[in-house]
Structure formats: structure tokens, C-alpha cells
Design a protein with these regions (language model features):
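N-terminal secretory signal peptides that target proteins for export/translocation
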Residues: 1-11
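Bacterial N-terminal signal peptides
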Residues: 14-27
Length: 167
């Protein structure tokens, strides 16, 4: 089979075009990422003689986030604008061993949005949300979740719908 010079140049041109398109798409996604999640950990926390879940998200810069509570199944959604994921050692989805959390997953539903979803066994809601300044590893964004029943969950869900952004 003989390939003409013209066909070979056309194939090379298409390859360069696809490579250029790939680079543009990759650069576009990174252009939005002004911040990056560099770590995440979960532990138990005592609040009013009850055990809850403490979620700590470590980032390069102070985190701006919006929180949303959903039911059927219960879950907490954390959207982080202009944030990418730089957590090579953390699986993109996994189980949680601290109640009321049961699992997590993260990704970028849009190039400019980093999203973390915490699946909940029960109708838990954030009772404390705060930021800590860098201490060696980076900025920390902390959310304490506690199951205080379905009514408290619905009240918190409604409040977060009205004012989802946390700075």
C-alpha cells in the first residue's frame, strides 16, 4: 500500500490540529483553577455530648464554597468555584468510617467547579463551618456535621438554599 505525500501531510495536519485542540482544552480547565484541594480528612468530633463528623478540606488558598443539603438519599454537596483537585493519593470515591457519613466522591462537574459530595446515613446538617489559617500544610476549611433529626436537616437545608456561599 502506497501513501502519497499529500495524504501523509493531511494526516500530520490532522494530528497537529487534534493535539492543539487538546492543549487548548487542558489550558482552559486549568485557567479556572485559581485554587486547589490538596488534602481531605474525616474524623469524629464531640458536639453537645454527641458524636458528629468533622470534615477538613486542605487547600492552597483560602476556600470559597457553597453548601447544599439534599435528601433521598441524604447528602452534603460542597461546590468550590475555581478549584481543582491535587490529591493523587486520595481515591475519587470511597467509604467513610465516621457516622453520619457513609461515603464520599469528588470531581469537577464543570471545569471551573470543584465538587465534593458526602453521602450521609442520616439527616445530618452542618452545625459549624469555619476556616483555619495555614499551619504548614495549607489553608483548612472545616465542616462539623451532626444528626439532630429530620426537622433540623430540613431547616438547615432551607437556610443553605437561601444563603449557600461560605467565605
Amino acid at each position: 500500500m502506497m501513501i502519497t505525500v499529500k495524504a501523509m501531510l493531511a494526516a500530520i495536519g490532522r494530528s497537529i490540529l487534534f493535539l492543539a485542540m487538546g492543549l487548548v482544552l487542558a489550558a482552559t480547565g486549568q485557567a479556572f483553577a485559581e485554587n486547589a484541594v490538596t488534602g481531605m480528612r474525616v474524623g469524629a468530633v464531640q458536639i453537645d455530648d454527641r458524636t458528629g463528623l468533622r470534615l477538613v478540606i486542605e487547600t492552597k488558598a483560602p476556600l470559597k464554597a457553597s453548601l447544599l443539603l439534599l435528601q433521598s438519599p441524604y447528602r452534603l454537596v460542597i461546590d468550590m468555584p475555581n478549584t481543582s483537585w491535587n490529591v493523587d493519593k486520595l481515591a475519587q470515591r470511597g467509604k467513610l468510617q465516621v457516622a453520619p457519613g457513609s461515603a464520599y466522591r469528588f470531581g469537577n462537574p464543570k471545569p471551573e467547579i470543584g465538587r465534593l459530595v458526602i453521602e450521609l446515613e442520616k439527616p445530618a446538617a452542618p452545625v459549624r463551618v469555619f476556616a483555619l489559617p495555614p499551619a504548614g500544610a495549607g489553608n483548612r476549611f472545616v465542616i462539623d456535621l451532626l444528626d439532630r433529626g429530620k426537622t433540623a436537616f430540613l431547616v438547615a437545608s432551607s437556610a443553605l438554599e437561601k444563603t449557600p456561599n461560605i467565605d
